[in-house]
Amino acid sequence: MAETNFNYSKLLRNLVTEDNVLNEVVVSFLYQLFPRDLFVRAFSLLESADMFIYVWMPTPKEADELLESLYNGTPLYRPIVRPRGPDDRPVCVDLDHWFCSCTEFAATCRPHLVGDTPLSDALFRPTEAADPDDCFGMLAGLQHLRADPEKLMCEHLFAFAILLQTDLRVLRHFSTGPGAQVFVLGITSIDEWLKLHLNVV
């Protein structure tokens, strides 16, 4: 199969079986598929209990409804990674615009900023469209993207994309039950939502 036709979402949604168990065969394959230990770092982040997804919901919802809305609805949400040290800052992720506030992601653009070529010319060119069913792989087919998608990826973007752009089953596996390691929190108060943006985002 040609790399341009590879459906990452279809593969990553098989990370968790129907019985809510990690599929070790898929985990091993993904380890080989992604470069420079990216999968290992993203998977470690998924198991770190440092990932939070804050969801704005003016009307309170049950926990399962809240998770389903992240796949079946269009809620306003903020994926955030808790700082690891006292001097660290929270990492904010925006999957819709493929942006992360971490230094690793910023470093991918830095060489283009110091060069003579404008950033838009350095990173963009016409490309073929991606498979419309492959939410996770859409980065590779963004109109005009020149840079290698793997270079515009960090562990935070990868981990949240695994949770939010593959299958609801994967999100449930990591965010529900006694062993939950990713926290999905609904916010119903506009004051609390604004405080989140002032204090974290």
Curated annotation (Swiss-Prot):
The keyword DNA damage applies. Disulfide bonds: none annotated. GO terms for cellular component: nucleus. It is found in: Nucleus. The keyword Plastid does not apply. GO terms for biological process: DNA recombination; DNA repair. Keywords: DNA damage, DNA recombination, DNA repair, Nucleus. Belongs to the SHU2 family. Plays a role in a RAD51/RAD54-dependent homologous recombination repair (HRR) pathway to repair MMS-induced lesions during S-phase. Required for error-free repair of spontaneous and induced DNA lesions to protect the genome from mutation. This is Suppressor of hydroxyurea sensitivity protein 2.
